[in-house]
Amino acid sequence: MLKYPDYISKLISFLKKLPGIGFKSAEKIAFELLEWDPSQIEAMAQALQEFSTSHATCSNCFCLKISQTSPCNFCSESRDSSSLCIVATPKDVFALEKSKIFKGHYFVLGNLLSPITGKHLSLEKLAILKQRIEACSPKEMIIALDATLEGDATALFLKQEFSYLPIKISRLALGMPVGLSFDFVDANTLARAFSGRNCF
């Protein structure tokens, strides 16, 4: 069987690691790149290198830092410290910021609880979250997680974990399609779900 040159096979294997990219899509992208001007490929390689060395997360909230200020922009005193929004990924922070509905602080959990795979929350992040809530005493903790099995399980865990605190715990209202992640929810729908959040 005729095989691709190693440099193409290697690129395909890396592209396949991206979410939503299977072999056929990776193959198509690889051959599309063959048509690019070498300067374009070099520019993309440089962008990937800069991405690898430049991105950083805040040690307080785990949001992506958009500047070198400390605390980060999302932890600054200019934001409303009375509300803390719990999200799964740094990308979710930007989705909520686009909706312009939330002006408080964030905390990025990272991986969610998975009853199917047995994946657990990061104990280190949970400890940091507890310290932050106990130190800052926000009035409301808003759980803004995807309407999925993992999101539901994680939301329930957080509710139970922080039930001893005198803090309002709410979750996004109906309007967030079940099983859909923030990636596929437009800013207006997200804003309505946020403004209509309920205690649970």
UniProtKB/Swiss-Prot annotation:
Matches recorded under CDD domains: TOPRIM_recR
Which InterPro entries does the record cross-reference, listed alphabetically?
DNA_Rcmb_RecR, Rcmb_RecR, Rcmb_RecR_Znf, TOPRIM_dom, TOPRIM_RecR
Give start-end positions of each zinc finger (C4-type). 58-75
**From which residue to which does the signal peptide run?**
none
Keyword S-adenosyl-L-methionine recorded = no
Q: Domain of life of the organism in this record? A: Bacteria
Q: Name one GO molecular function term.
A: DNA binding
**Keyword terms:** DNA damage, DNA recombination, DNA repair, Metal-binding, Zinc, Zinc-finger
Identify the residues that the record assigns to the Toprim domain, covering every copy. 82-177
Family in the record: Belongs to the RecR family.
| Function recorded in the entry | May play a role in DNA repair. It seems to be involved in an RecBC-independent recombinational process of DNA repair. It may act with RecF and RecO.
Q: What is this protein called?
A: Recombination protein RecR
